[in-house]
Amino acid sequence: MAKTYDYLFKLLLIGDSGVGKTCLLFRFSEDAFNTTFISTIGIDFKIRTIELDGKKIKLQIWDTAGQERFRTITTAYYRGAMGIMLVYDITNEKSFDNIKNWIRNIEEHASSDVERMILGNKCDMNDKRQVSKERGEKLAIDYGIKFLETSAKSSTNVEEAFFTLARDIMTKLNRKMNDSNSSGAGGPVKITESRSKKTSFFRCSLL
């Protein structure tokens, strides 16, 4: 059976339990929101195929358990991941503080050139906010990572987050193929236009 996609990207959602990783995954993969999700036990994944620059990209998105006792299960899934979303809950200060621990986990277990993005989730709950946008942005700048505030409930910036991460992976792949071509390795490879990587920040805006 012929492949129905040009690229397969493996993405990971990591972060503390209860920050809304599963809700983000379901909003993006099925455009659905459910407040009754129980904490993910172990690992689950969803697939959605998107189009970027005329190429079909199959996104295999893994939802990892945030509880400490599942950390050993999760570490095996870092291998092969091309993009990782670090998710915290803007109404939960501790989940934000733990992002640094999750980044340390990535540095220990993931590929050195994995694309990363920090997401401050539940930005629809502004009245219960404990972490300001500015603090989220500053943390992202400190680590050289892109940042978005999202809401799975209101669908704010969910599409933008996944598309931005996929585009950054695509840009990196194109750059690698260009480098490979220019060094004479392998046969001809068709390259789509590569965009220079920029660190940009998006704000949560509710209409």
UniProtKB/Swiss-Prot annotation:
Modified residues (Cysteine methyl ester): 204
UniProt PTM: Phosphorylation of Thr-72 in the switch II region by LRRK2 prevents the association of RAB regulatory proteins, including CHM and RAB GDP dissociation inhibitors GDI1 and GDI2.
In-chain residues carrying the UniProt-annotated modification Phosphothreonine: 72
Tissue and organ expression note: Hight levels of expression in the spleen, heart, kidney, testis and brain. Expression increases in Sertoli and germ cells during their maturation.
Propeptide residue interval(s): 205-207
GO cellular component term of the entry, any: plasma membrane
Control of this protein's activity: Regulated by guanine nucleotide exchange factors (GEFs) including RAB3IP/RABIN8 which promotes the exchange of bound GDP for free GTP. Regulated by GTPase activating proteins (GAPs) which increase the GTP hydrolysis activity. Inhibited by GDP dissociation inhibitors (GDIs).
Residue numbers covered by motif Switch 2: 63-80
Chain location of the short sequence motif Switch 1 per the record: 31-45
Membrane topology term: Lipid-anchor
Alphabetized Gene3D superfamilies for the sequence: P-loop containing nucleotide triphosphate hydrolases
Signal peptide (UniProt feature, chain positions): none
Keyword ATP-binding: no
The keyword Cytoplasm is assigned to this record: no
Lipidation (S-geranylgeranyl cysteine): 204
Catalytic function, reaction form: GTP + H2O = GDP + phosphate + H(+)
Record comment regarding domains: Switch 1, switch 2 and the interswitch regions are characteristic of Rab GTPases and mediate the interactions with Rab downstream effectors. The switch regions undergo conformational changes upon nucleotide binding which drives interaction with specific sets of effector proteins, with most effectors only binding to GTP-bound Rab.
Subunit structure: Associated with actin, delta-catenin and alpha and beta tubulins. Interacts with OTOF. Interacts with PEX5R. Interacts with RAB3IP. Interacts with VIM. Interacts with CDH1. Interacts with MICALL2. Interacts with GDI1, GDI2 and CHM; phosphorylation at Thr-72 disrupts these interactions. Interacts with MICAL1.
Protein name in UniProt: Ras-related protein Rab-8B
